[in-house]
Amino acid sequence: MDNAVDGLDKASIANSDGPTAGSQTPPFKRKGKLSTIGKIFKPWKWRKKKTSDKFRETSAVLERKISTRQSREELIRRGVLKELPDQDGDVTVNFENSNGHMIPIGEESTREENVVKSEEGNGSVSEKTPPLEEQAEDKKENTENHSETPAAPALPPSAPPKPRPKPKPKKSPVPPKGATAGASHKGDEVPPIKKNTKAPGKQAPVPPPKPASRNTTREAAGSSHSKKTTGSKASASPSTSSTSSRPKASKETVSSKAGTVGTTKGKRKTDKQPITSHLSSDTTTSGTSDLKGEPAETRVESFKLEQTVPGAEEQNTGKFKSMVPPPPVAPAPSPLAPPLPLEDQCITASDTPVVLVSVGADLPVSALDPSQLLWAEEPTNRTTLYSGTGLSVNRENAKCFTTKEELGKTVPQLLTPGLMGESSESFSASEDEGHREYQANDSDSDGPILYTDDEDEDEDEDGSGESALASKIRRRDTLAIKLGNRPSKKELEDKNILQRTSEEERQEIRQQIGTKLVRRLSQRPTTEELEQRNILKQKNEEEEQEAKMELKRRLSRKLSLRPTVAELQARRILRFNEYVEVTDSPDYDRRADKPWARLTPADKAAIRKELNEFKSTEMEVHEESRQFTRFHRP
């Protein structure tokens, strides 16, 4: 059967337009035709470049590192990375969990399709239904499950696998290209489901199909889990086997929800019965894209929808009493195999040993109250559980299992027998399982990874998962590590690198240095000695002043003895002309004359012609050298 599933996976991945789930590199863009045409006209690019060995080795190392890179969810689960707060408004690309790994929704849908196809042979998974048909199915499952005892965690009566009915042409097994490719490639486009979900007053048209049974169970489990974390005590009261207890439980959940809605503005208020029931039915089919974080656009629309109802708390409690039956407008449901109960589907979703919880009287997913399913969209289901070791668990697994501490805090619930004691082992087992799975399952588009793999994969295998990764991230800060690794003075003294010295020894060393310096300074010659050696001149201010005065007198005497101009003329040393000759000259351009710049092509041709004529007729040339005469071109 595994081989068949593998074959289906490969076939569907090959046919789907989205990026392949197992690919290690993101899909690269095709080069346009222009670049190849351009190379034809560039002959210097024709020769094939030889790839260097270094380049090949580096690329091989990089591919190996990328193949062993762990997903962000894996690192959060191991406690290496802290989980960043979800940015509600900024999320443009919806990611979905598949067994602890983040992949785009387009990939997940193809993967879920394959699982549905392969498991249909076993009759274990029900096929996809539009949301209105699921509501009609809810009605049937309600009546079936009320007759059973609440304490029995057994399967509902499983029908034999029936042939898949002919769907409409839109609902092909692979979702339409717009749905998958749009979700995976264009992050800014919202899938059509989400627009239908918030349509204010009308019943929306049937949306294109999403991955069916596993996603609905995840949402149902997520809704029950989110109710636990919001702290509404009344919703968790154990339900009795009688049919009348169901509406009562739903009223309590509704009233507790109305209380929390009144206190916090961010919570949704449901206004009228068709809208609430329609929202709940859409919630069950809209896949995990709503669980992982809605775009800001849909949040705003839902918030406007809340504000249309004044005094919603009083109206809600009255209207929710009549809200339990689903809307009567529904086409006849196609024959379906009943879905697996919550435990079995959780096991198929996360193939790890887990502690399983079923809310109330272990009802299958389709039998859950629509008002409970409505809260699957609540952002409060983004809670993360912590195991005994303090590691955060990814959201998908958090919907399927819980820890001993939380079981003690919450109201009494039914556990699958024999698994309570294994909760601590199941966490460590799931960690090891995830560590093994990430190499095969991981894709390169799994959101931001906050570190880069600097070391070889061997180091990853050496240490245990958490410590090796933590040390790898710490190793990035090399300076801090080097400073932290510097040995202390005591260690250096212990290793005999530094000599151990007491305070007295240090004082003695200082005194020795001081005496050396004093001795050297005392050996310097004094100023008197230098003056005696005539190195330093004696300074006497009176003598200096006298020398200056003498210099001035000598200079002034020289200046006073200078002859006047008349004396110089008399001695005929200076001769002045009586007049100055002045000649007029025209102003002209002193740059060199360039006649060739003024010649036109016709002038040049005439000059060449004249030269040729002169050389051929008039110029005297020796007969033997006439052949060497150079003529200008005409």
From Swiss-Prot:
Residues that bear Phosphoserine: 16, 423, 522, 560
InterPro entries reported in the protein's UniProt record: RPEL_repeat
* Residues modified as Phosphothreonine: 25
Give start and end residues of every RPEL repeat.
Answer: 60-85, 477-502, 515-540, 553-578
Please name the taxonomic classification of the source. Eukaryota, Metazoa, Chordata, Craniata, Vertebrata
Q: Which family does it belong to?
A: Belongs to the phosphatase and actin regulator family.
Q: Which Gene3D superfamilies match?
A: 6.10.140.1750, 6.10.140.2130
Task: List the PROSITE patterns hit by this protein, alphabetically.
Answer: RPEL
- UniProt-recorded name of the protein: Phosphatase and actin regulator 2
Q: Which domain of life is it from?
A: Eukaryota
Q: Where is the composition biased (Acidic residues)?
A: 452-464
Q: Which UniProt keywords apply?
A: Actin-binding, Lipoprotein, Membrane, Myristate, Phosphoprotein, Protein phosphatase inhibitor, Repeat
Quaternary structure, per UniProt, is:
Binds PPP1CA and actin.
As one GO molecular function, the record gives: protein phosphatase inhibitor activity
Q: Where is this region: Disordered?
A: 1-32, 84-344, 412-471, 485-508
Name the residue ranges with Basic and acidic residues bias. Answer: 108-120, 137-147, 291-304, 488-508
User: Bias category Pro residues: which stretches?
Assistant: 153-162, 324-341
